Swiss-Prot record:
The chain crosses the membrane at residues 29-46, 118-133, 142-156, 197-218, 274-288. Its EC number is 1.10.3.9. This is Photosystem II protein D1. Gene3D superfamilies: Photosystem II protein D1-like. The gene is psbA.
Length: 353
């Protein structure tokens, strides 16, 4: 016993730090990924809050026409946003020390790069921390795998898309209306609604919502009665109990008769794998779609695909969508371009006289 106490006392400060960092007895697990996650997410969050409240207007298009995004410069919670870094900066790494002054850094949208790069590093470390805690507890690694879907989606819109388009100014603004503006412009320039990977993402999100509601309602409807009519059904469950809290056979029988037998899972493990995999795979595909459209491999183009015997175009919904795309493209960045590329003439029209 004496030897053990002496060994503990002689343990280095670094050793005690390592044990504390990797201990699963802490109220919140830190882990080695947490060592990087905590400062990066704190930095991103702090700068976001300060910039959302007080950042001056940013010259997003690089044409000396600053755009206001903060609350103190006339915005509200819905219209406010962290304006992306200026097109004049492009993809250059733009920390504070690269600018001539803090005023110049703010004018060129430096906070956007700072927030986005710290945020992406932070959420990637959060994913690693999920794996690390699972590993230390002897669990399987699928929690981190599932979280990789939103990490991939965030990386696609904040990093891959700006790289493909050549400027951080094309990244998604950090705000409510800025997100909607990004979506509208993305549709105008890339026809994302006609991209099969986006369709898979929609199926993943809507399907995941449907399956979650179906599963929750089936379980809630087939609980094993443990309470009286005067008590909440929730009182019939005790945390950690070994007995099943609902009758999976009853749920399986109900759903099998409602649809057909093989539409219902008879294995709880495969059911829950399916519930996790469906939305995750869908969002993976959407992130992959954004990453390919970043390099202008766009959605399907079926414009003017149907013509009559005289060669006249019979409009389809694809043509209606195309007309909407052109309208949206005309309206965005209206001071930076005379015409969007789709509407610009290849050659100047001939004139008489």
């Amino acid at each position: 016993m004496t030897a053990i106490l002496e060994r503990r006392e002689s343990e280095s400060l670094w050793g005690r730090f390592c044990n504390w960092i990797t201990s699963t007895e802490n109220r919140l697990y830190i882990g080695w990924f947490g060592v990087l996650m905590i400062p990066t997410l704190l930095t991103a969050t702090s700068v976001f809050i300060i910039a959302f409240i007080a950042a001056p207007p940013v010259d997003i298009d690089g044409i000396r026409e600053p755009v206001s995004g903060s609350l103190l410069y006339g915005n509200n919670i819905v219209s406010g946003a962290i304006i992306p870094t200026s097109a004049a900066i492009g993809l250059h790494f733009y920390p504070i020390w690269e600018a001539a002054s803090v005023d110049e850094w703010l004018y060129n949208g430096g906070p956007y790069e700072l927030i986005v790069l710290h945020f992406l590093l932070g959420v990637a470390c959060y994913m690693g921390r999920e794996w690390e805690l699972s590993f230390r507890l002897g669990m399987r690694p699928w929690i981190a795998v599932a979280y990789s879907a939103p990490v991939a989606a965030a990386t696609a819109v904040f990093l891959i898309y700006p790289i493909g388009q050549g400027s951080f100014s094309d990244g998604m603004p950090l705000g409510i209306s800025g997100t909607f503006n990004f979506m509208i412009v993305f549709q105008a320039e890339h026809n994302i609604l006609m991209h099969p990977f986006h369709m898979l993402g929609v199926a993943g999100v809507f399907g995941g919502s449907l399956f979650s509601a179906m599963h929750g309602s089936l379980v809630t409807s087939s609980l094993i009665r443990e309470t009286t009519e005067n008590e909440s059904a929730n009182e019939g469950y005790r945390f950690g109990q070994e007995e099943e809290t609902y009758n999976i056979v009853a749920a399986h029988g109900y759903f099998g008769r409602l649809i057909f037998q093989y539409a219902s899972f008879n294995n709880s493990r495969s059911l829950h794998f399916f519930l996790a995999a469906w939305p995750v795979v869908g969002i993976w595909f959407t992130a992959l779609g954004i990453s390919t459209m970043a390099f202008n491999l766009n959605g399907f183009n079926f414009n003017q695909s149907v013509v009559d015997s005289q060669g006249r175009v019979i409009n389809t919904w694809a043509d209606i969508i195309n007309r909407a795309n052109l309208g949206m493209e005309v309206m965005h960045e209206r001071n930076a371009h005379n015409f969007p590329l789709d509407l610009a003439a290849i050659e100047a029209p001939a004139t008489n006289g």
